[in-house]
């Protein structure tokens, strides 16, 4: 297996999405609350991705002080405008109920794939799967270790790998003798969220690093300062795949809407 350059891979992926846009009109509504610096940056990137792919971005920005009731009303109005997809930029201020807001988004518009009955796969595991398939990873019969069992990364990632006939171990904070599972793995997908979590283990297989952590003022993953060239970079790795998968889900939503 060859680990493809993710920046080059996602550039080609977005070009492919744009090529599919012929005759398809797609709009992505991005709901942002407050003026969080990180959220501003992420929304800026997603807007640029939309434009690059031929998708119309619609940015709905509300003050941090907005009430739950007011925001729910605004969200209902956005839904009535019938965009192809809707996402809510996270994190939200503490006084807002994230789960309640996401529950209001129709399944056909849930392009983040956050709802349990969404029509789309969550973007991060979808992006990872498509990337690994392009790299030629032989899922069938391989031992895949997924570390982290969140509802939007670990669990759906394990399901996708199982659907591709891999033998999957879903590890978590209570897993005993993790080193044994690491030693037996043909591929590791780590979504723990602890800087350098994997550094204490000898690893000689491909690693997809989903971790987003800050250490000494720098963005790092769950595996840092490693000589293993088979580890995806942070930054410039899974985040790019996630954003491309969002564009992929959005065009799927547009095609569904136009049927």
Identify the function of each model-found stretch:
Residues 85-139, 196-198:
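Anion-binding alpha/beta catalytic cores of soluble intermediary-metabolism enzymes, centered on
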Residues 50-64, 168-171:
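Short beta-strand elements in bilobed, periplasmic/extracellular small-molecule ligand-binding domains
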Residues 70-81:
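Short, well-structured alpha-helical segments in soluble
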């Amino acid at each position: 297996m060859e680990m493809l350059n993710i920046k080059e891979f996602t550039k080609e992926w977005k070009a492919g999405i744009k090529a599919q846009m012929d005759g398809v009109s797609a709009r992505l509504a991005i709901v942002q609350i407050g003026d969080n610096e990180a959220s501003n940056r992420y929304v800026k990137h997603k807007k640029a991705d939309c434009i690059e792919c031929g998708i119309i971005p619609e940015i709905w920005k509300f003050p941090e002080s907005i009430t739950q009731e007011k925001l729910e009303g605004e969200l209902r109005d956005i839904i009535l405008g019938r965009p192809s997809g809707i996402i809510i930029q996270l994190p939200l201020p503490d006084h807002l109920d994230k789960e309640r807001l996401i529950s209001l988004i129709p399944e056909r518009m849930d392009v983040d794939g956050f709802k349990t009955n969404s029509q789309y796969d969550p973007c991060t595991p979808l992006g990872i799967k498509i990337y690994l398939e392009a790299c030629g990873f032989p899922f069938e019969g391989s031992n895949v270790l997924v570390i982290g069992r969140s509802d939007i990364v670990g669990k759906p990632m394990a399901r996708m790998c199982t659907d591709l006939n891999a033998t999957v171990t879903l590890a978590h904070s209570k897993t005993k003798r993790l080193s044994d599972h690491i030693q037996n793995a043909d591929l590791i997908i780590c979504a723990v969220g602890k800087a350098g979590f994997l550094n204490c283990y000898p690893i000689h297989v491909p690693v997809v690093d989903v971790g987003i952590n800050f250490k000494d003022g720098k963005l790092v993953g769950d595996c840092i300062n490693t000589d293993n060239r088979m580890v995806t970079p942070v930054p410039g790795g899974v985040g790019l795949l996630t954003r491309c998968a969002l564009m992929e889900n959005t065009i799927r939503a547009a095609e569904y809407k136009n049927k």
